[in-house]
């Protein structure tokens, strides 16, 4: 930087500080309110989508207004349906609604292509520092764990809502590793609102059983 005439910074902001600066300011919150109004105008919810939107936002409101130290479980919401049923549109509205309220959220997806649909989204492997494995390297008896660094742990600790698109397309070992991570990463277990979207018709019956087992035991 000094080569181009810029002063050398005394320190670099942490990941949490970067996220707060980017999303938790009045200008950005107003932009998200405008975005939400635009989405509602161009792609209004049908009755089922509106019920889902209100139910999830009420759950998020109750969760974020509770004492986090007294919570004892995650809250899961799943938006399911085949392509063209409005999952992505509803997801975008929920993101905008949360950010317009100044909530700190994070968004991940099963693939890079899916992550590109949403502002600030990354792949689930990237968010949770979980390595991409070849199928022959997977060992169910000794599952791979998430390798979260200090800055990412600090950021996740302050997050209220985790949005996860194409949830069912991820390997079950990743999902189990994430849930185990939140039990052991900090001195006390930390709980979150998970809002997941996907199409169960896209996975085999065996994979569906694995996903549903993980999902049901953590409701």
State the predicted function of each range.
Residues 1-219:
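Conserved ATP-binding/catalytic motifs of P-loop helicase motor domains
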């Amino acid at each position: 930087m000094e080569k181009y005439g810029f002063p050398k910074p005394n320190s670099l902001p942490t990941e949490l500080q970067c996220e707060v600066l980017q999303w938790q300011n009045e200008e950005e919150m107003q932009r998200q309110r405008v975005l939400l109004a635009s989405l509602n105008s161009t792609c209004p919810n049908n009755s089922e989508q509106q019920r889902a939107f209100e139910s999830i936002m009420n759950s998020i409101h109750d969760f974020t207004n509770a004492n986090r130290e007294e919570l004892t479980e995650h809250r899961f919401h799943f938006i399911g349906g085949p392509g063209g049923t409005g999952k992505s549109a509803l997801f975008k509205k929920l993101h905008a609604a949360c950010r317009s309220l100044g909530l700190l959220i994070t968004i991940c997806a099963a693939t890079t292509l899916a992550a590109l649909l949403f502002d600030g989204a990354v792949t689930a492997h990237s968010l949770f520092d979980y390595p991409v494995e070849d199928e022959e390297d997977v060992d169910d008896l000794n599952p791979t764990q998430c390798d979260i660094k200090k800055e990412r742990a600090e950021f996740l600790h302050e997050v209220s809502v985790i949005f996860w698109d194409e949830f069912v397309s991820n390997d079950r070992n990743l999902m189990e590793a994430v849930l185990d991570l939140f039990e052991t990463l900090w001195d006390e277990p930390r709980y979150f609102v998970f809002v997941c979207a996907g199409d169960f018709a896209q996975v085999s019956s065996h994979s569906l059983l694995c996903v549903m087992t993980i999902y049901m035991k953590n409701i």
